[in-house]
């Protein structure tokens, strides 16, 4: 996995979830906030991060910084993904399927945010199992990491990309 320098990219961010967390201590309850943020450049780079703090803006800032350190490159064929993928993280499973151009992003919630910020315009997805935003995002990223272009598959098999289908 190669490091992607976030300072060279024009990144947009999207807050997917903010959770209120309470810790019960002797004097009462201690309140904190956890944020889940997705960042992407709409050109094949996307990342996610989580942050916790006493105030919401600080949690979002921390999550955004963490997301910029966690960028991945999404291989694309035109406006969609190269092949089907299944991402699994914990109890969450995400099935990603390529779609024809013009069909749009058929995904809900956190998966839609990841796909739009990655620049994938046409994809179909199905969320199976856990629907917790953090598990869904992590499973989506596992699915995106498993994607390979035809050239990468050809190199792994030791044949040229033209002879891959034979």
Swiss-Prot record:
GO-annotated biological processes: translation
GO annotations of cellular component type: small ribosomal subunit
Entry keyword annotation includes rRNA-binding: yes
Molecular function as annotated in GO: rRNA binding; structural constituent of ribosome
Span of domain S5 DRBM: 11-74
Alphabetically ordered keywords of this record: Ribonucleoprotein, Ribosomal protein, RNA-binding, rRNA-binding
Domain note: The N-terminal domain interacts with the head of the 30S subunit; the C-terminal domain interacts with the body and contacts protein S4. The interaction surface between S4 and S5 is involved in control of translational fidelity.
Family designation: Belongs to the universal ribosomal protein uS5 family.
Subunit description: Part of the 30S ribosomal subunit. Contacts proteins S4 and S8.
UniProt xrefs under NCBIfam families: rpsE_bact
Function summary: With S4 and S12 plays an important role in translational accuracy.
Protein name as catalogued: Small ribosomal subunit protein uS5
Gene from which the chain derives: rpsE
């Amino acid at each position: 996995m190669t490091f992607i320098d976030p300072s060279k990219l024009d990144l947009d961010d999207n807050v997917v979830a903010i959770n209120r967390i309470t810790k019960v201590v002797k004097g009462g309850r201690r309140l904190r906030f956890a944020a889940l943020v997705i960042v992407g450049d709409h050109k094949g780079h996307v990342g996610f991060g989580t942050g916790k703090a006493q105030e919401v803006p600080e949690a979002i800032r921390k999550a955004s910084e963490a997301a910029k350190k966690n960028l991945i490159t999404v291989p694309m064929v035109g406006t969609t993904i190269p092949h089907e993928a299944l991402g699994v993280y914990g109890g969450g499973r995400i099935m990603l399927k390529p779609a024809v151009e013009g069909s749009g992003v058929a995904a809900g919630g956190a998966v839609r945010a990841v796909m739009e910020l990655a620049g994938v315009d046409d994809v179909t997805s199905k969320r199976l199992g856990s629907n917790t935003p953090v598990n869904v995002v992590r499973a989506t990223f596992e699915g995106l990491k498993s994607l390979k272009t035809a050239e990468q598959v050809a190199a792994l098999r030791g044949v040229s990309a033209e002879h891959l289908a034979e």
